Amino acid sequence: MKTTIVKVWIDNEAVYIQTNKGEIFSERFANYPRLHTALPSQLADFECDNIGVRWEKLDEDLSYRGFMKKEKYLHPV
C-alpha cells in the first residue's frame, strides 16, 4: 500500500501529518525561524498539496518526505 497523507493540522508548537497507515509525524515550529516567529493567524494560513505543506505568506515549505525521514514518528492512531 502506498503511503498517502490523510490529515494535516497544527497546534501552538508544531505541524502534524497523519498517513493512511495511521502514522503521525511532526515538525516543530522552533526548528524553522519563519514559522517560529510567526503569529498564530499566519501559522493557520497554510496549504497542502501532494508534496507538502506551504505557508505562502511566510515563504516556507515543508515536504512530507522530510517529516518521514526523521525519527519523529509519534504513534499509530
Where are the regions that the model predicts?
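Motif-centric detector for short Cys/His coordination patterns
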Residues: 1-77
